[in-house]
């Protein structure tokens, strides 16, 4: 009976740790520049105490997993310029032993595109990212994103991304900013009175 109790307790503990919720909430929007040019905007709200990492790699490609944006169906459009970031900062993090490029609370990414096919209704993207707090990191995970060029289109992001993978399509990875363009977080040495 005791062995059964221990086994059952271990199984329940395993289930509870496997159900850690993602501390991010991702949304997309589209800004139309012209009939053939758009800015695809991705925003992530990040729970307090957690960080999402920049697309910029750390020193010698070490440190946390950098965020990636992988675009599918790229025969219908071109990526123009880099996938810009707003809210990123560099900060020395003891556990990594180096400056880490990260977001806290909120992240914003903007990718400009030019259409090759004016009839496409949406752009499918998979964001791949990792989140950490001061004590743990969750395994890197994908987030399926759809940018609706036609607001009336009704698609399920995971189904679209899976269909591209099932068809054997290789996505194109967006280029992020250079690490040297990210400012170091200012640390105040003034005391509050």
Give the positions of each predicted feature:
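N-terminal hydrophobic targeting signals that begin at the initiator methionine
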Residues: 1-2, 20
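Sec-dependent N-terminal signal peptides
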Residues: 3-14
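Extracellular/lumen-exposed scaffold segments
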Residues: 18-193
């Amino acid at each position: 009976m005791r062995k059964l109790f221990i086994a059952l307790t271990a199984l329940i503990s395993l289930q509870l740790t496997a159900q850690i919720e993602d501390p991010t909430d991702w949304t997309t929007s589209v800004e139309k520049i012209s009939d053939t040019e758009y800015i695809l905007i991705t925003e992530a709200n990040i729970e307090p105490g957690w960080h999402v990492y920049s697309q910029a790699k750390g020193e010698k490609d070490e440190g946390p997993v950098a965020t990636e944006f992988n675009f599918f169906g790229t025969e219908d459009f071109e990526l123009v310029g880099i996938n810009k970031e707003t809210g990123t900062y560099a900060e020395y993090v003891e556990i990594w032993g180096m400056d880490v490029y990260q977001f806290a609370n909120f992240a914003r990414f903007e990718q400009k595109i030019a259409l090759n096919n004016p009839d496409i209704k949406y752009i499918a993207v998979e964001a791949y990212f990792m989140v950490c707090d001061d004590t743990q990191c969750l395994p890197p995970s994908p987030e399926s994103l759809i940018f609706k060029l036609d607001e009336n289109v009704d698609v399920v992001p995971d189904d679209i991304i899976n269909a591209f993978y099932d068809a054997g399509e290789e996505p194109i990875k967006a280029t992020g900013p250079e690490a040297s363009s990210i400012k170091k977080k200012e640390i105040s040495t003034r005391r509050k009175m």
